[in-house]
Amino acid sequence: MKKFLCAFAFAVILSGSAFGASESEMKRMSVFVSNFTEVGMYHIDVDDISDSELAFFGIWHNWHNNFKSRIQRCPNKNCPYGGYIIDKKYVAESIKKYFDTEIDHQSTENPKWGYYDGKRYYHFEGATGEAVQARVTQVRKRGDTIIMRGVTYWPDNDEIEGRPFTATATPYKYNGKNTWAILTLEVED
């Protein structure tokens, strides 16, 4: 029994210490991770992310969460790049808030998902569908890094089994509020 306890304690030290997150903190972490899963970003590594991927996140995060206040119809009749626009400042703001980084504005890999006009707006075609959410069930801390584990889920369909995920983030202040900046997210295939 002593060998088991020693091995368990050693594993905890190697994997990071338990982090006593409250229920409300776990809920905030779940919402934080859901900001990425709801736009279909299941594999994130900030060391390898491109400005195109950041632009994609900034556009679609606002589509899901700030539609009425930040998304507008394209004023150009038969707009060749989609029926909606968003000001680049809102895209940059979302990227700063969730990634704690700046963006060199450019179009996404698929221009229909976000064409940058080189001036002020991203143009894109809207989309519908149910957003995949995340539920954080375990939290650990390793140095300044928070490790969140959990499962994805579909809010309107409990019968579909979600996929496990691991996310890492670093705490920081955004506009005077405590939050996190994503470092990695890996949703199992």
Locate each region found by the language model.
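Exposed beta-sheet edge and beta->alpha loop/turn motif
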Residues: F124-D189
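Hydrophobic helical h-region of N-terminal Sec-dependent signal peptides
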Residues: C6-L14, A18
